Amino acid sequence: MSTKIITQGGHEALKKELDYLWREHRPDITQKVAWAASLGDRSENADYQYNKKLLREIDRRVRYLRKRLEDMRVVQYSPEQEGRVFFGAWVEIENEAGDLKKFRVVGYDEIYGRNDYISIDSPMARALLKKEVGDEVLVNTPEGEKLWFVNSIVYER
């Protein structure tokens, strides 16, 4: 089960998506379904079948977003977090080969479509929690344990 926390920006993005789906996208698709249904035989009507399927997907996403937004807690930045990795931190790490990775530790619902976000529930984020700049971090991966060094920690305020 995913942790039910989210950043303020993530919360606003989900609310914006919900608003778009409910107020703009769904009415548009509903209108298309009604138009396609008016053409007659629905069993061989590709427009009707496609848009009806799309309407079900929109409704499923709307239900999911409403439930998640109701259940989630927005985590605000606190000055006490400074200097350590906690939820919402931008972290830069480096391995022994000199490979760099930079990402933000966020909630599960915020990671999709973003290569620079990782879930607080991921093994990397769990290993990094409470670490400071200069600390070594041992992360369990499918290929075995990997060693990383924390280069920087920054918070958006």
UniProtKB/Swiss-Prot annotation:
InterPro entries: GreA/GreB_C_sf, TF_GreA/GreB_CS, Tscrpt_elong_fac_GreA/B, Tscrpt_elong_fac_GreA/B_C, Tscrpt_elong_fac_GreA/B_fam, Tscrpt_elong_fac_GreA/B_N, Tscrpt_elong_fac_GreA/B_N_sf, Tscrpt_elong_fac_GreB. Keywords: Coiled coil, DNA-binding, Transcription, Transcription regulation. This is Transcription elongation factor GreB. Necessary for efficient RNA polymerase transcription elongation past template-encoded arresting sites. The arresting sites in DNA have the property of trapping a certain fraction of elongating RNA polymerases that pass through, resulting in locked ternary complexes. Cleavage of the nascent transcript by cleavage factors such as GreA or GreB allows the resumption of elongation from the new 3'terminus. GreB releases sequences of up to 9 nucleotides in length. Belongs to the GreA/GreB family. GreB subfamily. It comes from the Bacteria. Pfam families: GreA_GreB, GreA_GreB_N. PROSITE patterns: GREAB_1, GREAB_2. The gene is greB. GO terms for molecular function: DNA binding; RNA polymerase binding.
